[in-house]
Amino acid sequence: MSAITITDAAHDYLADLLSKQNTPGIGIRVFITQPGTQYAETCIAYCKPGEEKPDDTAVGLKSFTAYLDAVSVPFLEDALVDYATDRMGGQLTIKAPNAKVPMVNEDSPINERINYYLQTEINPGLASHGGQVSLVDVVDDGIAVLQFGGGCQGCGQADVTLKDGIERTLLERIPELKGVRDVTDHTQKENAYY
């Protein structure tokens, strides 16, 4: 497999699990939720015949087929699925070192580039106050619609953070962006930092 390695021990463990499903042709589907973000999670699920997606990459293994989610494939590069026995029986492990690595460039869609800068440059600073900001939408006029959460929701400094920090950073990095707009309900102040 090019993007992911499934060890013999993991293959045998998964093949045993699949054989107990009493579904001819059942395989696994490997995907990453929220790939390229700090929230990325690598998942393996049963995949009955017909449940695979049309753009999945089918990888034929000795006893079953592994379907790799098309969006997840670049993030599965160098991933390893292994099974290790221990005193309690054993554990299936998935190591995907690139799952949280953003993969954007100047040609990436604007929403992906905004999310990249929010996750890599802006949210790490907001985290020191227990806050974060997320992209809700990019409207037709080139405005990024953002929503604060955590310690930033209801914070008295949110306007300053939005204009002097977030907007300035995003406009420097993404020239076609025209501005940002906050849609947070700042009347909720119970978690506010200031």
Curated annotation (Swiss-Prot):
One Pfam match: NifU
- Species per Swiss-Prot/TrEMBL record: Pseudomonas putida (strain W619)
GO BP term, pick one:
iron-sulfur cluster assembly
What does the cofactor section's free text say about binding? Answer: Binds 1 [4Fe-4S] cluster per subunit. The cluster is presumably bound at the interface of two monomers.
List the SUPFAM superfamilies hit by this protein, alphabetically. Fe-S cluster assembly (FSCA) domain-like (SSF117916), HesB-like domain (SSF89360)
Alphabetized PANTHER family for the sequence: FE_S BIOGENESIS PROTEIN NFUA, IRON-SULFUR CLUSTER SCAFFOLD PROTEIN NFU-RELATED
The alphabetical list of record keywords is: 4Fe-4S, Iron, Iron-sulfur, Metal-binding
HAMAP family xref list: Fe_S_biogen_NfuA
- Which residues are noted in the entry as [4Fe-4S] cluster-binding? 152, 155
Q: List the molecular function annotations (GO) for this entry.
A: 4 iron, 4 sulfur cluster binding; iron ion binding
Q: Which InterPro entries match?
A: Fe/S_biogenesis_protein_NfuA, FeS_biogenesis, FSCA_dom_sf, HesB-like_dom_sf, NIF_FeS_clus_asmbl_NifU_C
Family classification: Belongs to the NfuA family.
Q: Does the keyword 4Fe-4S apply?
A: yes
Task: Summarize subunit and interaction data from the UniProt record for this chain.
Answer: Homodimer.
Name it: Fe/S biogenesis protein NfuA
